[in-house]
């Protein structure tokens, strides 16, 4: 599907003066993207969970690109905080040109949030899905960019069992399922929201803080063969700034190239069912 005529945030490329919202902005890909996008002249809006790291990145962006960015604290493991965040953002910004849904994590043992959802699914998919829907009117004519991963091939999406209660827990599979959900959400959003250019992307294997507090964190933080956060953020930054006519709404990108998806992830009917199940899960009846 090619993009329709609305502006989509940056019709001719570039970001000067645009409002760019980045979740998961306090470390890794989100931090790197915030710095790069601010350097292009955008008004960056940061969202993060940890107040100290949020202050640190706010100061880094200010030193790099001038005025301090706006910053909002929210823990995506609590949907109440996501709803409150949505209200604050709607009150503050009449338009959001780009929303980069980048918040994420991996939980090595099964964890249930106070909302009753498996934590990986909620933090990586449901919370961002809810926030995008809350900001739907502000995103009109803009872009929605969802961080995914080629780990989606390990996912097992079941709209009738979002929590995966029917299967033994696997951290890798839960992570893959959440990333699979983001690709499918982008596909379905492109169908339902034709005035929003919606894409997902694979950042590559990146050195990040994911898995902190576990043995695996050593792999993700210090493996010299993994990409830097800046390299991982490159496709996100490009998707935010590229001319709209160069992009395909609903597409999945890797290294600035459109990449085909396979298996159930490519099933449009399943994507529609996932959308409805996710909306029911977060208690949001808006279309």
Curated annotation (Swiss-Prot):
This is Putative daunorubicin C-13 ketoreductase DnrU. Substrate binds at residue 149. The keyword NADP applies. Keywords: NAD, NADP, Oxidoreductase. InterPro entries: NAD(P)-bd_dom_sf, SDR_fam. The active site is at residue 175. NADP(+) binds at residues 24-30. One of its GO terms (molecular function) is oxidoreductase activity, acting on the CH-OH group of donors, NAD or NADP as acceptor. It comes from the Bacteria. It comes from Streptomyces sp. (strain C5). It is an enzyme of class 1 (oxidoreductase). Belongs to the short-chain dehydrogenases/reductases (SDR) family. Its EC number is 1.1.1.-. Could reduce the 13-carbonyl of daunorubicin to produce (13S)-13-dihydrodaunorubicin. Could also be able to reduce the 13-carbonyl of doxorubicin.
